[in-house]
């Protein structure tokens, strides 16, 4: 397996080669490092990774030595001869979004304010991946404090789309998506509050999973909107996402919002060996298509065509597909931005230049000191959202805005939950268009916010959703659709996506 083949391979392909002894973890890490270094020297770099960890090769050597030691001691022949018990991800690298803590590494959230901050511990999801043998490869670019839909609001500069470097890779986890799509990492962690995993996945032609709220621990993630935030995954195949979920999901004592799925949900645990739905199982499935999203203004004809192609495929599998109405979805984007900005204003109050953030002029009065630190440290989009959030929470307007938005959010969650009692899935496009040109929306906040039209309701309703690449536009830009399930039904979502992935035309 040569270096180019390594950087095009999925986790599962690399895992098979490692267990067969055909390649080493050190070869894998070096192959990705070479792609990263070559890209940084190019005239138009992707800007996907902001740091390639210097100790990644050392961890790779340790993984190779452990595998060799176990193989020698067990003398096991056959398929499991190169596997190591309890470490299904041994020697496999992954990239980490810059707002997820990796012990001893910078965690800047793409902000000048945290330029010198190093994480004192691993995020729980990172720790669980490490415990399974995986190797953190580097930090990925992001919109500052995860506030954006294009990865242009970053102190490191924009991230470009590997399919067309004049266009966005999406946001706020655009660096993670570009790293995987651009051959700089085989797998990446992102976070999403209103679509920041699924949108970049759609724009870059990847699978992107946003799990049920609470399935993955948020411990070690720098908070944006605490009732919305969730770690998600970027991968080139369904099996990689299933493999990651199998080792990272579950209750964490460090995060009170994390939980194990209630037994009454009948949720099947996601395992590495995930089978697609059979033909018989497909015949009893029902999928709902919300008219409010399909008929939304601004949907590009290429997106509509690829979505209809996916619906045609569903019907060919004997899945019952029906159009439905979800009236509350029309309020999803404004409700999301009211809730998210209010929570952001509260969460970001800690970055005052005293305990967190860069210190300013210590001779200034406290109020002036805070103002100076935040004005110089926060970018314009973060400042805008903090101002909106404080306005929403102010004594005179909290009843008009925040409390009303919370009530409407409950209505959205209720409508989605009731619908999913009658249907197994909701399906819709991930975005109204393919990746848009860099600079097109950065000076038009409302246009940027409307990028989240198809994604925010999922976060408000705390549902699992997967962006699935289904084709390309007439100009070759990737197009994605979403498969959305009931809470805790990640396994069902992934199984339907895997049947699509394994279909002859894919």
Curated annotation (Swiss-Prot):
Q: Which SUPFAM superfamilies match?
A: Amidase signature (AS) enzymes (SSF75304)
Q: Which residues cross the membrane?
A: none
Question: What keyword terms does UniProt attach to this protein?
Answer: ATP-binding, Ligase, Nucleotide-binding, Protein biosynthesis
Q: Which reaction does it catalyse?
A: L-glutamyl-tRNA(Gln) + L-glutamine + ATP + H2O = L-glutaminyl-tRNA(Gln) + L-glutamate + ADP + phosphate + H(+)
Catalytic positions? 97, 172, 196
**Which residue ranges are recorded for the region named Disordered?**
153-177
Identify the enzyme class: ligase
Report the GO molecular function annotations.
ATP binding; glutaminyl-tRNA synthase (glutamine-hydrolyzing) activity
Q: Name one GO biological process term.
A: translation
Quaternary structure (record)? Heterotrimer of A, B and C subunits.
Function per UniProt: Allows the formation of correctly charged Gln-tRNA(Gln) through the transamidation of misacylated Glu-tRNA(Gln) in organisms which lack glutaminyl-tRNA synthetase. The reaction takes place in the presence of glutamine and ATP through an activated gamma-phospho-Glu-tRNA(Gln).
Q: What is this protein called?
A: Glutamyl-tRNA(Gln) amidotransferase subunit A
Native organism: Treponema pallidum (strain Nichols)
């Amino acid at each position: 397996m040569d270096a180019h083949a390594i950087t095009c391979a999925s986790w599962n392909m690399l895992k098979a080669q490692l267990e067969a002894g055909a390649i080493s973890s050190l070869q894998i890490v070096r192959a990705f490092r070479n792609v990263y270094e070559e890209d940084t020297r190019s005239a138009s770099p992707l800007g996907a990774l902001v740091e390639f960890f210097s100790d990644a090769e050392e961890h790779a050597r340790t993984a190779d030595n452990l595998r060799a030691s176990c193989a020698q001691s067990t003398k096991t022949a056959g398929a499991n001869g190169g596997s190591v018990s309890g470490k299904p991800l041994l020697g496999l690298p992954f990239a980490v979004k810059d707002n997820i803590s990796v012990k001893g590494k910078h965690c800047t959230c793409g902000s000048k304010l945290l330029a010198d901050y190093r994480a004192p511990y691993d995020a729980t999801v990172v720790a669980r991946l490490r415990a399974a043998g995986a190797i953190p490869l580097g930090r990925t670019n992001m919109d500052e404090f995860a506030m954006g839909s294009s990865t242009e609001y970053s102190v490191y500069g924009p991230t470009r789309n590997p399919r067309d470097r004049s266009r966005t890779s999406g946001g706020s986890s655009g660096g993670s998506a570009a790293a995987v799509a651009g051959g700089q990492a085989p797998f990446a962690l992102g976070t999403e509050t209103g679509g920041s995993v699924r949108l970049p996945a759609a724009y870059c032609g990847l699978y992107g999973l946003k799990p049920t709220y609470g399935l993955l621990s948020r411990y070690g993630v720098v908070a944006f909107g605490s009732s919305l935030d969730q770690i998600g995954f970027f991968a080139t195949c369904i099996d990689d996402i299933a493999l990651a979920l199998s080792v990272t999901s579950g209750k964490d004592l460090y995060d009170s919002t994390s939980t194990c799925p209630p037994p009454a949900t009948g949720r099947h645990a996601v395992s590495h060996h995930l089978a697609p739905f059979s033909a018989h199982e497909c015949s009893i499935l029902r999928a709902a298509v919300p008219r409010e999203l399909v008929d939304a203004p601004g949907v590009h004809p290429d997106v509509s065509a690829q979505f209809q192609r996916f619906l045609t495929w569903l019907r060919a599998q004997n899945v019952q597909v029906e159009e439905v109405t979800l009236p509350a979805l029309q309020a999803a984007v404004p409700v999301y931005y009211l809730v998210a900005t209010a929570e952001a204003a509260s969460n970001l109050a800690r970055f005052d230049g005293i305990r967190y953030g860069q210190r300013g002029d210590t001779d200034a009065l406290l109020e002036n000191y805070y103002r100076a630190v935040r004005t110089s440290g926060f970018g314009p989009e973060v400042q805008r959202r903090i101002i909106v959030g404080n306005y929403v929470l102010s004594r005179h307007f909290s009843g008009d805005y925040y409390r009303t938005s919370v009530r409407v959010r409950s209505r959205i969650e209720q409508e989605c939950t009731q619908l999913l009692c009658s249907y197994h899935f909701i399906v819709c496009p991930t975005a109204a268009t393919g990746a848009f040109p860099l600079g097109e929306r950065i000076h038009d906040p409302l246009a940027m916010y409307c990028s989240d039209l198809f994604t925010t309701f999922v976060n408000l309703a705390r549902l699992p959703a997967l962006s699935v690449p289904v084709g390309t536009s007439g100009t070759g830009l990737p197009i994605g659709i979403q498969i959305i399930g009931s809470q805790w039904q990640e396994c069902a979502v992934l199984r339907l996506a895997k049947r699509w992935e394994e279909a002859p035309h894919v």
